[in-house]
Amino acid sequence: AVGIVMKAVPVRTTMNILECILIDATTNVIKFTGNDMELGIETIVDGEILEKGKVAIEAKLFSEIVRKLPDSEVTITTDSNYTSLITCENSKINIAGKSGDDFSYLPIIDKDKMITISQFKLKEIINQTIFSTAPNDNNKMMTGELFEVSENTLKVVGLDGHRIAIRNITLEGRADDVKVVVPGKTLQAVSYTHLT
């Protein structure tokens, strides 16, 4: 879960909180979230919540700690100063955290306006069109791809000023018409991430 969320943690930022992973156990599930304000990834992990709460922990350090822990049960306990104790078998690590309230949450998506497409098909579409997006920010619109749904057809268009790639597929079921430009960085992350 941490490795997936790390894809959305920026390498450099002026907002220190974005260098963190949010661990949110305020509901009945444990959510790990990374967000660089352009790409946000949230993943849900199984676990037992003894006391509800949330904390933002420096992502790179947390990722290194988790990677080196044995494949066993991990317990995270956070005090009122957001210092977190990570326990796994004989390992105990204290790490400074920050208030989870300061973390930039992901937008809430209206599930009434969604399309359903297989993970394989989505990755295939991205891989067949992403090469024709612009690599720099001179024109923001060209660094992403147009996703257009019209009459139950999804059209994906990548354009960099010299090349164009278009892919059309028919969607199952009924879908509302919509046009949205998805940043290339986001599409690259989706293409390389195992989704569930």
Name each model feature, range by range:
Residues 1-195:
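Structural preference for solvent-exposed beta-strand-turn elements
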